[in-house]
């Protein structure tokens, strides 16, 4: 029982401090089966039944404040490593994030507005840093429709656009602060209007999409990425829940944002609390990770709850020489996307 309680504490702690997006800002979207698409529109047909696992989705689009925090910790305007290394994360904007003497910050008055001018690569990088990912197109549509509630509204939360969306009739063609319209039935805001939102999928016709009907991820390649939800200058007809558009992953606009999704962490298959994974423990200078698996990512959180390391490791060891004494939380992600968590004591 004691180990189980520790597991819950560690899961919550990891969720709270990595990327500063706490579970209280996430909505659990319970898995289920729904009808995806709309046979009335060629880009949205054919309809098909899709089954999704449970996931968490952020209540709001990622804000300028949150994205600025990421940039200051990440320390680069381009992707630093991996297959997308060198890709631009975002472009500065007077409605978005600006650089002030070397520090990124939200434009004055736009702190709680959706982060904009972010490329798909930037949205993907933020989500990974925050311990999550972008939603698939199927997850996005399912959540916008209210998940297992299976609402039949035209828009996300209502068939009256003005109740739930900023769009052509009421926005004045400017972005609005997140969460200022009514949420849908599961507590998600702004899934219709305000800004389009990136999805993880490459864009393709549904008829050509060979993804499975369970947790589909879209085509394996393409030239543009899916965006969903409509934006503040669309007419109401372009805000319907199955409407889909696409743009190049390198592009960024002042009407395109994104939101975070996290997988559900369960003791059985997602995260283990390990007591002998790190050696030596207590540590002074270097730490070895005792695993035969290749390490995909390592995050270290200091005693104050701040993320102080977020990177890959080489040869399964890393240096803690620059860290003050204290108890740290170490989260290790292997190439099978399984996470392990252990406390590390630094004592010199």
Locate predicted features.
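C-terminal outer-membrane/trafficking sorting elements
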Residues: 271-348
């Amino acid at each position: 029982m004691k180990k189980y309680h520790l597991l819950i504490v560690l899961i919550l702690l990891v969720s709270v401090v990595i990327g500063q997006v706490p579970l209280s800002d996430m909505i659990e979207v319970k898995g289920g089966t729904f009808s995806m698409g709309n046979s009335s529109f060629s880009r949205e047909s054919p309809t098909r039944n899709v089954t999704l696992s449970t996931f968490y989705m952020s209540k709001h689009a990622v804000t300028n404040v949150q994205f600025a925090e990421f940039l200051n910790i990440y320390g680069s305007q381009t992707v630093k490593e991996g297959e997308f290394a060198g890709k631009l994360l975002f472009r500065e904007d007077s409605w978005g994030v600006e650089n002030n003497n070397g520090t990124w910050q939200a434009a004055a008055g736009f702190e709680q507005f959706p982060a904009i001018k972010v490329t798909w690569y930037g949205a993907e990088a933020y989500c990974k840093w925050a311990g999550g990912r972008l939603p698939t197109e199927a997850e996005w549509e399912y959540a916008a429709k209210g998940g297992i509630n299976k609402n039949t509204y035209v828009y996300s939360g209502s068939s009256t656009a003005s109740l739930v969306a900023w769009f052509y009739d009421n926005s004045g063609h400017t972005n609005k602060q997140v969460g200022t319209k009514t949420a849908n039935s599961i507590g998600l805001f702004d899934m219709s209007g305000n800004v389009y939102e990136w999805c993880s999928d490459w864009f393709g016709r549904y008829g050509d999409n060979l993804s499975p009907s369970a947790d589909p991820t879209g085509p394996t390649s393409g030239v543009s990425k899916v965006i969903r939800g409509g934006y503040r200058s669309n007419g109401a007809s372009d805000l319907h829940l199955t409407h889909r558009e696409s743009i190049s992953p390198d592009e960024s606009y002042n009407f395109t944002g994104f939101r975070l999704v996290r997988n559900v962490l369960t003791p059985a298959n997602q995260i283990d609390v390990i007591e002998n994974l790190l050696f030596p423990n207590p540590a002074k200078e270097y730490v070895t990770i005792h695993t035969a698996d290749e390490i995909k990512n390592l995050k270290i959180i200091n005693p104050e709850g701040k993320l102080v390391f977020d990177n890959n490791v080489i040869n399964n060891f890393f240096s803690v020489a620059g860290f003050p004494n204290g108890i740290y939380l170490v989260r290790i992600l292997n190439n099978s996307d399984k996470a392990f968590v252990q406390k590390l004591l630094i004592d010199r």
